[in-house]
């Protein structure tokens, strides 16, 4: 396999605090708070799954929070965002209603999909989230169609399609890239390259580890970046989204990241019986997008450990209340 990602895929790299130069303090606090909220929400889901409170599969995205948070900073409620099977962060970054997510995953009628969808069938159109599905690459063509509809409706709304490196092996993705480029559809393709599709590393599935090569093949402007640097994600997304809204056609952003948990449920070191290197998992955890931003803000004296602890303590209280409420809600 050709290593085109270079140091981006090296788990021993990019452990240092990130650059926050010329960044708005309020935006930094907002992004940090959002990432912490998503992380803590998924910790609750992991606990619930481990202890038999949740039925059905739960795909957790801990370690990947910077991607959805950085991109959602530049989206409107009228944009059309489509997720995949690991989409808790995609939804929560648009609408931080973790109570409704808890209710949905627990199968309660107060959930985002009235308790009928669970973890992988999430829907929140009022906040721009048009759905997630368990079918790999199942929403990509829908996102292109929604983006084209925005053009027909003469709005500056855009479509957003979240896909993983595994989804890039599905034919519909390549058809969607081609159609979007030919029609100049206003859509952002977001490739979350966490190097694994289910339990299989990308080196066992593709001749190159750089998924954005497929964007190049379709003449789609692309950016390849560290997906665990929320400031770089935000800045890059802003540039691409501004171009898309101005009528320049589709864009693609590939973000190299790593999921801390296995493919499904709460275990951190195995994927369908295949053990990942414990050293790699620990090194990737040292590239934690939350701690990297937090350290940068503390170093810049715009944040403190005390403020972060207060934020987490208050969040823990609200999460516990929401979980208990959802547990006591009615089934549909």
Could you say what each language-model-derived stretch is?
Residues 129-328:
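Glycine-rich ThDP/TPP pyrophosphate-binding loop and its adjacent helix/strand module
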Residues 1-67, 261-263, 268-332:
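Conserved acidic/glycine
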Residues 1-10, 26-39, 78-81, 104-115, ...:
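Short, charge-rich amphipathic segments
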Residues 43, 47, 51-183, 201-207, ...:
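Cofactor-binding active-site loop characterized by glycine-rich and histidine/acidic residues
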Residues 6-8, 18, 28-32, 53-54, ...:
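N-terminal start-of-chain detector that recognizes signal peptides
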